[in-house]
Amino acid sequence: MSGREGGKKKPLKQPKKQAKEMDEEDKAFKQKQKEEQKKLEELKAKAAGKGPLATGGIKKSGKK
């Protein structure tokens, strides 16, 4: 019976310790992801803005 109790206690303790360790790592990792996402969003916005302008220019030149 003590084996079962020990089995229950160990999993409960492990996630707490891992959560604390992962918190620091997760914070740094999340910050990196946020920075990368911001860069990607900026690039996407620039690319999206340039895309329609380029196609619009082609269409206009085609009409002329």
Swiss-Prot record:
What does UniProt note about where in the body, tissue by tissue, this protein is expressed?
A: Expressed in dermal papilla cells with aggregative behavior.
Q: Name one Pfam family in it.
A: TMA7
Bias category Basic and acidic residues: which stretches?
27-45
Q: Name the gene for this chain.
A: TMA7
Q: Report the domain of life of the source organism.
A: Eukaryota
Give the family, as the similarity comment puts it.
Belongs to the TMA7 family.
Residues that the record marks as modified (ADP-ribosylserine) are 61
Listed A to Z, the keywords are: ADP-ribosylation, Coiled coil
For whether the record's keyword set contains Acyltransferase, the answer is no
Q: Does the keyword Coiled coil apply?
A: yes
Region described as Disordered: spans on this chain? 1-64
* Protein name, UniProt field: Translation machinery-associated protein 7
Question: Which regions form coiled coils?
Answer: 21-50
